[in-house]
Swiss-Prot record:
This is Probable sugar efflux transporter. GO terms for molecular function: carbohydrate transmembrane transporter activity. It comes from Helicobacter pylori (strain J99 / ATCC 700824) (Campylobacter pylori J99). Belongs to the major facilitator superfamily. SotB (TC 2.A.1.2) family. The chain crosses the membrane at residues 16-36, 51-71, 82-102, 110-130, 138-158, 170-190, 210-230, 247-267, 277-297, 300-320, 338-358, 361-381. GO terms for cellular component: plasma membrane. Disulfide bonds: none annotated. NCBIfam families: PRK03545.1. It comes from the Bacteria. It is found in: Cell inner membrane. Keywords: Cell inner membrane, Cell membrane, Membrane, Sugar transport, Transmembrane, Transmembrane helix, Transport. InterPro entries: MFS, MFS_dom, MFS_Efflux_Transporters, MFS_trans_sf, Sugar_effux_transptr_put.
Length: 391
């Protein structure tokens, strides 16, 4: 009997691991164009700023597509749906690698964004379903770990492949890795009927839950603040702090590494006091941004700020996602789709705000504006916490 239980635990952990790998590959491809922007622009004889529109477009497609695409797929058995999403993901990466002009590349990125929209709408609830008993929270942490590793390993490796070969090879390799993950899913995942996915009728029901709506608004606010600064952290470190490109790369690596620590802390501390955990994680996101310019020339302080910031944003993202699932157990996929859409509204808005700040005020002010948006989000958290204390 003990062997059977151990075998079950091991098999369940393998399934969680497959989802973690999936998170890794999806997050890698979302942000890898940042590392390849100059090479892509050069190959199409375009400006980097114009090519960068595909990053903005990706975020907005995910924002607009998450809920309607999830609703359209609400009744589809989840394993079959995941395999279809990976097939679309792989085909789109083949198209990216073969793209004969920028518009074909942009079209291929839209295909990836569609897959992303549904994937992140259903994955959090699925990883909890396949996780070992009494390991649900840790499973969500492992899912976030996959996302963090994309920043630590995915982006640097993508850039290295692009430098050694070319940017097309990077997309080709991502498609190849996705094919292996798809085979693992086909082999390891059980039949997963759609459960508590929700329907269009679930949306007005969820919107009548004030704390849940408050959390969605909180996500938009705090993620907008984060990406106001983070979208332009590389040029800030090089141009304002005047650190070398190698130091800049190392700092971005530290940011991703901090995400692993954030995932670990979530698994250990969130259940003890979820409200305080969320508030403290927000402080870790806000303070480094506000102090970024103040300590711009102190290398070790910037390293520390980057590390704390990375812990904060990863911890906060998982905690808010868990809170959404707790507040909408009857429509987890719809709730997750709205969460994913809200998060990507934050990404797109933050990048836009940062661009406006740079053009109107200067690159050195991005941390102040991003931190100020974070403070507004913190005040909003305080308000909804007091207003809906019993929820």
């Amino acid at each position: 009997m003990m062997i059977t239980k151990q075998s079950y635990q091991r098999f369940a952990l393998m399934r969680v691991f497959v989802f973690s790998l999936s998170a890794f590959i999806f997050n890698t491809t979302e942000f890898v164009p940042v590392a390849l922007l100059s090479d892509i622009a050069k190959s199409f004889e375009m400006e980097s700023a114009t090519v960068g529109l595909m990053i903005t477009a990706y975020a907005w497609v995910v924002s607009l597509g998450s809920l309607p695409l999830m609703l359209l797929s609400a009744k589809i058995e989840r394993k079959r749906l995941l395999l279809f999403l990976f097939a679309l993901f792989i085909f789109s990466h083949i198209l990216s690698a073969l793209a004969w002009n920028f518009w074909v590349l942009l079209l291929s990125r839209m295909g990836i964004a569609f897959a992303h929209s549904i994937f992140w709408s259903i994955t959090a609830s699925l990883v909890i379903r396949v996780a070992p008993r009494n390991k649900k929270q840790q499973a969500l942490g492992l899912l976030a770990l996959g996302s963090s590793l994309a920043m630590i390993l995915g982006l640097p490796l993508g850039r290295i492949i692009g430098q050694i070969l070319d940017w097309r090879s990077t997309f080709g390799v991502i498609g190849g890795v996705a094919t292996l993950i798809m085979l693992l899913m086909w082999k390891l995942l059980p039949h997963l009927p759609s459960r508590n996915a929700g329907t269009l009728a679930s949306v007005p029901i969820l919107m009548k839950r004030p704390l849940l709506v408050g959390i969605y608004l909180l996500v938009i606010m705090v993620i907008s603040g984060h990406f106001t600064t983070y979208s332009y952290i590389e040029p800030f470190i090089i141009q304002i702090s005047q650190f070398s490109p190698d130091i800049t790369t190392l700092m971005l690596f530290v940011f991703g590494l901090a995400g692993v620590v954030g995932s670990f802390l979530f698994g250990r501390l969130y259940a003890k006091n979820s409200r305080k955990f969320i508030a403290f994680a927000m402080v870790l996101v806000i303070c480094p941004q506000l102090l970024l310019f103040v300590f711009k020339n102190l290398e070790w302080v910037i390293f520390l700020q980057i590390f704390l910031w990375g812990i904060g944003i990863t911890s906060l993202t998982i905690a808010l996602q868990m809170r959404v699932l707790q507040l909408a157990p009857d429509a987890t996929d719809v709730a997750s789709a709205i969460f994913s859409g809200s998060y990507n509204v934050g990404i797109g808005s933050g990048a836009l705000f940062g661009s406006i700040v740079i053009h109107q005020l200067g690159l050195e002010y991005i941390g102040f504006v991003g931190g100020a948006l974070g403070l507004l989000a913190l005040f909003w958290l305080r308000f909804i916490t007091i207003k809906f204390k019993k929820t």
